[in-house]
Amino acid sequence: MNDIYTQAQHQLDALGLRCPEPVMMIRKTVRKMAEGETLLVIADDPATTRDIPSFCEFMDHTLIASDISKTPYHYLLKKGL
């Protein structure tokens, strides 16, 4: 795993969860975070490759990095306003 992912302040294991569960879990986790904090999401649902970027855009969070070249997928999000 790239070093950028190890710097995340929070981590969410969404392995085995299927749409819409990963995004629901992300939303619940992000609500508890402070603005600017980061969240590493580890998932294996192929739908997350479109759902997580869309969620970030819709909710004004930043998708800092993603690795979807192989499973499990890794996403690094930064909480927005």
From Swiss-Prot:
Record-level GO cellular component terms: cytoplasm
GO biological process: tRNA wobble position uridine thiolation
Stored InterPro entries: Sulphur_carrier_TusA, TusA-like, TusA-like_sf
Active-site positions on this chain: 19
GO MF term set: sulfur carrier activity
Record keyword Cytoplasm present: yes
Location(s) in or outside the cell: Cytoplasm
Keyword annotations from UniProtKB, A to Z: Cytoplasm
Domain of life: Bacteria
Family as reported in the entry's similarity comment: Belongs to the sulfur carrier protein TusA family.
Xref: PANTHER family: SULFUR CARRIER PROTEIN TUSA, SULFUR CARRIER PROTEIN YEDF-RELATED
Name of this protein: Sulfur carrier protein TusA
Originating gene: tusA
